[in-house]
Amino acid sequence: MAAANKPTPNLDHPTLKIVKEAFAGKRLRATEYRGQTTLIVEPADLHAVMAFLRDDPRCDYDFLSDVIGVDYLDYPAETLGRFAVIYNLCSYKRTDRIFVKTFLNPSIPTDGIEEDPALYVDSVTDLWPGAEWTEREVFDMFGIRFRNHPDLRRILLWEAYPAHPLRKDYPLRGRGEREQYRVISRTDA
C-alpha cells in the first residue's frame, strides 16, 4: 500500500507578503489548511494589523464575515495558547479571503466567570461595526473580553449566568442549571 502524499502548504497568499513588509518588526506567522490561509498575530498587534488589512488598497478586506472563539484545551497538537479568536475577512473587490488568528493564555483558573486580564483583545467594531454581536457572542461563550467594545455584555445567556459554557472545562451536563432555573416548554409559553 502506497503512502499518501501529504499536500505541502501553499503560503503564497498575496496578502502575506504585503503584511509582513508593513509589520516587519512584528511577530507574524502564517498557516494554510485546505486552501485557507491564516495569519497569526500577537494580541497587542491585532487591531493595527486588522486596520491595515481593511485600509491598505493592496489588501482591501472590506468585509468581516465572522469572529470565532476557540478553546484548545486538550487539543492533540501543540498550540500557541489555550484560547484563540479568529477573524474571517473577505475582499469583495479582489474575491479573496484570509483568516486572522490571535492566541490568548488565561492567567487564572477558567472554571468561573472571573475577569481575566490575560483574556483581552482589542475590539474591531470601529473597523467593522458588524463585529459588535459576534464579539459579544465570543465574550458570552468563552469569556474573552474586547477592549473598547461599545456594548460588551452577554448576548445569549443572562448576565448572572455563572460560567462561559463553550470552554472545554465546562461540564457537558452543566453545573445544575437545569435544576436551578425554570425551563419554559412550548405548552407553558
Regions found by a protein language model. Name each.
Residues 1-189:
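Terminal low-complexity/charged segments
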